[in-house]
Amino acid sequence: MRLPVLSPTALRDEQKLLYEDMRKGIKSHFGGFESVRSDGALLGPWNPWLHEPKFGKPIWELVKTIVANPSLASPVREVAILVTGAHFRSAYELYAHVLIAEQRRLSDEKLSTIIAGQRPTDLTGPEGVVYYFASALVNGGVLPELTYRAAVKEFGANGTAELSYLVGLYCMVSITLNTFDVPVPD
């Protein structure tokens, strides 16, 4: 870990406001994995964002926007997030979202295959579209036209845009976690 975990009692004023908002959001949207220490300190990507509130606050606003009233089903979202986390080999990201995906009833076989960077054979139609979409984006270049059309057909224009922003956000989350070598909790 390259940054010390910030204790809530040691936060500057600008960090305190962000901390309180993050705590509230974590409680309502990010359960099922360890994201807050017993002393209230935030783990995962939230700690680096607290260190730099001028960057952390707008990133957190994007997170809140993307998790508020999503149009995409939870299992589909988790496939996109796991494809992204696996691409970046982001340990904390994979730890957290494997636990979430298990709660959303994605099979162990499906999860382990995605984490290995491969396409599971038992993906549903929507999951398959998302797998190809997220894989193409994280591997760089323009999203292939047929992949884009398949997403629009499956999720509509707004759902496709949401999927793009979701993958982009989790690229940023994964890079943040990797930059600061954020570990999986003990």
Regions found by a protein language model. Name each.
Residues 56-70, 113-116, 144-153:
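Short amphipathic alpha-helical segments and their helix-coil junctions
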Residues 66, 86-87, 117-121, 154-157, ...:
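A short structural micro-motif
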Residues 72-73, 105-109, 144, 156:
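Helix N-cap / loop-to-helix initiation motif
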